[in-house]
């Protein structure tokens, strides 16, 4: 037992010494390793309320109850590499739920920027400004991310984003 404890202590000390040595090596060679800068969200104003939307219905699995649409006019690949779009969910009873959404494909996070007041035709800013991890139990969200960010890869251009949406749109 004592031997194991001594060996464990020696391994821990060696690990700390190695970490210290790596820190010194990096500081002696400037530019050898540049830490990645933290992601910074691009702040954009809310777009105009979608009065002339071009709704494309997504092909959804049978487990998704509402019909799901994305306004192709609202698609935006922001400089911060997030995808912004207007989402419309239409219930079986005909009730519209429209929101301005964002996806950070590489991080698998989402954000709701605003919700539509369909009577007053205006946006109401979301009270939850944080980016949240995608809910793997939410079939609607998974359908949207699969449509806009196939294979969880962020689109490289606005054209690629538009093509992703067209390919995911329901064929009628």
Language-model segments: which ranges?
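Sec-dependent signal peptide recognition
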Residues: 2-8
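Short, linear, compositionally biased motifs with a strong N-terminal bias
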Residues: 10-12
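N-terminal signal peptide c-region/cleavage motif recognized by signal peptidases
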Residues: 14-16
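N-terminal secretory-pathway/extracellular module detecting exported/lumenal segments
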Residues: 20-172
């Amino acid at each position: 037992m004592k031997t194991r404890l001594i060996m464990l202590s020696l391994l821990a000390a060696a690990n700390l010494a190695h970490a210290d040595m790596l820190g010194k090596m990096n500081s002696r060679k400037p530019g050898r390793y540049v830490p990645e800068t933290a992601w910074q969200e691009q702040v954009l104003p809310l777009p105009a309320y979608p009065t002339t939307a071009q709704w494309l219905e997504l092909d959804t699995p049978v487990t998704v109850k509402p019909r799901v649409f994305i306004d192709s006019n609202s698609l935006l690949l922001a400089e911060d590499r997030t995808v912004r779009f207007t989402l419309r969910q239409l219930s079986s009873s005909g009730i519209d739920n429209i929101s301005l959404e964002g996806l950070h494909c590489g991080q698998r996070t989402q954000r709701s920027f605003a919700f539509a007041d369909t009577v007053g035709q205006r946006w109401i800013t979301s009270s939850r400004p944080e980016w949240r991890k995608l809910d793997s139990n939410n079939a609607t969200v998974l359908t949207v991310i699969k449509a806009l960010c196939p294979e969880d890869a962020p689109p490289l251009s606005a054209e690629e984003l538009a093509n992703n949406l067209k390919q995911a749109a329901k064929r009628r």
